[in-house]
Amino acid sequence: FTTDVDPWPIFAAIRPGWLAFSVGLFVFANVLVGHRFLALAPREYTGEMRGFPVGTLFFAGSVFSLVLPGPVGEVAAVAALRQRYGIPMSVAFAASIHARFVGLASAALMALVAFPFVSVEGTVGQVVAGGGVVLVLIGVGLGAVSMRPGWMVKLGSGLTKGTDRMGRLGGSLRVFGEALASVGQAPWTAWLQVFGWSLCIQVFQVAAMATLCLALNLQAHVAGLLMAQGTGSLALVVGMFLPGGLGTFEVAVIGSMVGAGGVSVVDAGTFVVAMRVVHLLGLAVSGVMFAAWANVFLSSSVVGELKGAEPGENA
């Protein structure tokens, strides 16, 4: 997927109105995360919470992910939720991760819908088909974990009896599984609401991609956009632990746009560069939201949690 794409012609030729619309859709989709969170979080803690303010708080927390690997933005957001609304951090983190797992299952469904339209001719199609299958299985698996986290608790408890390294891994799995289980007793209606909000978020993300194509005067099949959104969202899981995700998002989107979108490799590379521009402009908006929540994020309790989340801090 190596492409020689000069970004300057992209910036010179892009239509700013459609680009701004794409950024707006991208930001709106991310803010809807607040509604998805409230659909799953225990009601006794969410009486004063509203979807859009919570969503802006989560999106503002993504600023921290620019400089630190791992789910630091998520930690910042749930610490801010505790500071602002009094919800226990463990409950907020569990509900957030649980909802994101369901979101990955919806991304897998979106990619699965586009699979029949993938061209498997040549190396690109084979890579897209094979990689897409793996990513879909990951998404479905994480969705299954979100519904039945009990097996993770049992596995973690068993591993704690092993060697030091396996014991530490088992302890982490057990704590994580117990956190998921703490909100995993929600009724099926709550799970369906989370899944519905996740699909809504995915649809707005696809709409952002479609308007970006209009900004670039690029014609792509809808199946390619669905495939790019589904596999791209799943590939970003790597980005939770490695800054930039080692190009997994770019590979997933380029492969999807070529294999199912009917565009050339160079046009797909151009689209990815423009998509990253949308992400950066969206993060600029998240910086504005961070400024609005600065008194919460910069409080001593939130800063303390972030220091504890830094790599090597507790080594």
Residue ranges and their predicted role:
Residues 75-80, 93-96, 106-108, 196-197, ...:
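Hydrophobic alpha-helical membrane segments of integral membrane proteins
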Residues 60-68, 91-112, 235, 270-286:
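Membrane-embedded alpha-helical segments of transport systems
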